[in-house]
Amino acid sequence: MRILDRSVYVGPSLHAHFPVIRLDLDLGPLEEWPTGRLGSAYIDALAAALPGLAEHGCSYNAPGGFFRRMREDEGTWLGHVLEHVAIELQNIAGEAVTFGKTRSAGPPGVYTVVYEYAQRDEGIAAGELGLRLLSSLLPERLRPPGAVPEGWSWPEARDQFIRFAQRRALGPSTASLVRAAQERGIP
């Protein structure tokens, strides 16, 4: 599982009318391993790592919908899971982002993953950390070589990400001025 390409859209685009990041993701052999096949152990480990995912409604538009989608029938593919993880990582860092969309993109196993971001560097880092988290939760035999460095720790990586995001966040006064300008359509 690897990112083939990344695009950052700062304004209206084919994907949304607000800033989004697009990842072209190659699942490789993991195309044969949707979440239903990975099983409850994988899903439960993800739920423990990011409990806020329980609030994601996904296509059901109700809390718990995303985990329901992961467990139903075959489940869903890891590109779709990465979309939700990148959004949730930004949420735990204090950003109120919700939009995401994942679609198959040509060759089998290649997906276009699009998700909203509030701050460019934070959004990019959320996608990269999300990919590492998903890889770390895979059974050893399915884990892509080199995807998870020796000694990598999810709690430590999560905390570093939150600190990274907080250092880049606008202060309260500046943030309120920016929001007011956006609400009035002032660039």
How does the language model describe each region?
Residues 1-187:
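Preference for protein termini
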